[in-house]
Amino acid sequence: MDERLKGYKDVFADHPGVKVVEVFNIKGDAGNAFDRTQHWLTEKGVEHIDAFVCLEASSGKDVAEAVRRNNATDRLIVAMDTDEATLGLVKSGLIDATIAQKPFTMTFFGLKQLDDVHHYPVDLKRDFATDSFSPFPRFVDTGVSLVDKVNVDLYIQGRQEAQSK
């Protein structure tokens, strides 16, 4: 989560009109996302909130529901991941965009690296981040993409095809 938040803050730093008001950890509980969103919209006032950015997959739909209940559907919502509910809310326009990861690719490369460690043992006490002779990369970028109303149907179709296999 820290790296995701840092990524957003790095981008926001180039946009002086964007201000992060509060960051809260829902601790994997979507109910916390709903409750905190309700709090911000009712206690602080809808007119003072322009956007919500969700860093966990479980929070997007609950943030969207709180926004809908407060008739604040003109607020920007950026979610995380491509679960069925989130994609449906992107398609409906309640969520403006979601960041898609590649869970199958992430799993494949993770298992591949474990298999390599098993079949080609190395000294695991080495600092692979600074060792220029390390057999392992310091970081593996499996990619992300932005899903919005323009391309959401492609992701819905891809999800359905993956589930039907």
Residue spans for each PLM region:
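Hinge/cleft segment of the Venus flytrap/periplasmic-binding protein
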Residues: 11-12, 109-165
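Hydrophobic alpha-helical
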Residues: 8, 21-22, 27-89
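Short beta-strand elements at the ligand-binding edges of bilobed clamshell
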Residues: 92-104
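Ligand-binding cleft/hinge of the Venus flytrap
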Residues: 4-16
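Structural detector of well-ordered beta-strand residues that form the stable sheet scaffold
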Residues: 50, 77-78, 96-99, 147
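Hydrophobic alpha-helical segments within soluble ligand-binding/sensing domains
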Residues: 3-6, 31-37, 82-86, 102-125
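Short glycine-centered helix-capping/turn motifs at secondary-structure transition points
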Residues: 70, 93, 159-162
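A generic structural signal for alpha->beta connector loops
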Residues: 17-20, 74, 95, 143
